């Protein structure tokens, strides 16, 4: 979703005195609609809100959606992400006032989606759960289990869609899962992470890669980097989500197998798992890392990541290190 389109939408809403913004599409369309709704009553440049993260002084226009791509979960979330192509920045913004007033989710609308969009959507919704699941918060048994069950449901039905994009029941499960993944039910009472999203946004901003594809590269690399300090939650993930046998083996071996199975799942869907597949040059890692921390400082919750950490994670996404 790009800023010039948002500006045009704001102009049209003001010109015609519109009272509601209806988004018919996927996450990019819905996020654009939210930005338009935010900008119509705002005095000044709506991009300033994305930079400052300040809550709006005036109520945004109501937003409603007809979902055509289950992925971002924007149809039930209070969040929006916009790309400023001029400054090559991709930033998010959130306000309870941006949660859609209603959303229509009909699985039959997904039958014509290209396979690539299906795969990207699966990666995105899984990442929304990962950002909540991997936490330092203790005594989260119920929400742990809800996260794990939703991840297993997504993977099971993604494999069905991998062979048949017209399976109504599989799409229904995926659409409901994508909704649950990002309406924050799974994040209640948990310190959340959002490091992978912050790092991936720089890939999308600089190289215009698909968000889901970028996450399929960044997420396993991040897991490899932070898991040695947080073995318990990553063993739990490997056993309860990826089906690794929970034996008395060295925890690091269980974790490695869990991450390896996640990468194989991504590749099964045709997603990239290396920076090379995205044609991203290591020479841009320093710039992207600096950009990732430029607004709010170090990223992440489970582990705070500075510029040096982020560059190391980007390097772990390179095949020559990944398969060494």
Task: Show the residue positions of the predicted features.
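N-terminal small/polar loop signature for handling phosphorylated ligands or for N-terminal nucleophile
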Residues: 1-44, 160-171
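Acidic-glycine-rich active-site phosphate/pyrophosphate-binding loop
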Residues: 7-10, 96-103, 151, 189-197
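C-terminal charged capping/lid subdomain of soluble metabolic enzymes
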Residues: 234, 241, 245-324
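Active-site segments that bind and position negatively charged phosphate/pyrophosphate groups
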Residues: 132, 136-261
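A glycine/threonine-rich phosphate-anchoring loop and its flanking beta-alpha core
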Residues: 41-139, 236
């Amino acid at each position: 979703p790009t800023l010039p389109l948002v500006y045009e939408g704001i102009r049209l809403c003001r010109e015609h005195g519109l009272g509601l913004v209806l988004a018919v599409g996927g996450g990019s369309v819905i996020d654009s609609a939210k930005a338009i709704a935010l900008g119509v009553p705002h005095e000044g440049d709506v991009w300033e809100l994305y930079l400052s993260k300040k809550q709006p002084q005036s109520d945004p226009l109501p937003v409603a959606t007809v979902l055509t791509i289950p992925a971002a979960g924007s149809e039930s979330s209070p969040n929006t992400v916009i790309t400023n192509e001029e400054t090559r920045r991709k930033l998010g913004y959130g306000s309870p006032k941006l949660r859609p007033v209603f959303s229509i989710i009909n699985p039959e609308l997904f039958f014509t989606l290209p396979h690539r969009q299906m795969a990207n959507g699966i990666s995105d919704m899984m990442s929304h759960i990962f950002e909540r699941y991997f936490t330092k918060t203790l005594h989260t048994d119920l929400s742990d289990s809800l996260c794990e069950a939703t991840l297993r449901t997504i993977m099971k039905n993604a494999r069905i869609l991998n062979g048949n994009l017209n399976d109504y029941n599989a799409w229904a499960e995926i659409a409901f899962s994508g909704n649950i993944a990002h309406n924050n039910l799974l994040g209640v009472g948990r310190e959340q992470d959002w490091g992978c999203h912050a790092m991936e946004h720089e890939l999308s901003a600089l190289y215009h890669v698909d968000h889901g594809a970028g996450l399929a590269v960044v997420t396993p690399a991040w897991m490899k980097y932070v898991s040695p300090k947080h073995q318990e939650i990553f063993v739990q993930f490997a056993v309860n989500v990826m089906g690794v046998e929970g034996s008395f083996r060295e925890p690091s071996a269980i974790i490695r197998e869990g991450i390896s199975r996640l990468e194989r799942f991504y590749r099964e869907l045709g997603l990239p798992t290396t920076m090379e597949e995205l044609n991203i040059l290591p020479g841009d890692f320093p710039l992207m890392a600096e950009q990732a921390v430029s607004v709010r400082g170090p990223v992440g919750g489970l582990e705070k990541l500075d510029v040096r950490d982020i560059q190391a994670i980007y390097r772990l996404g390179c095949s020559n290190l990944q398969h060494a």
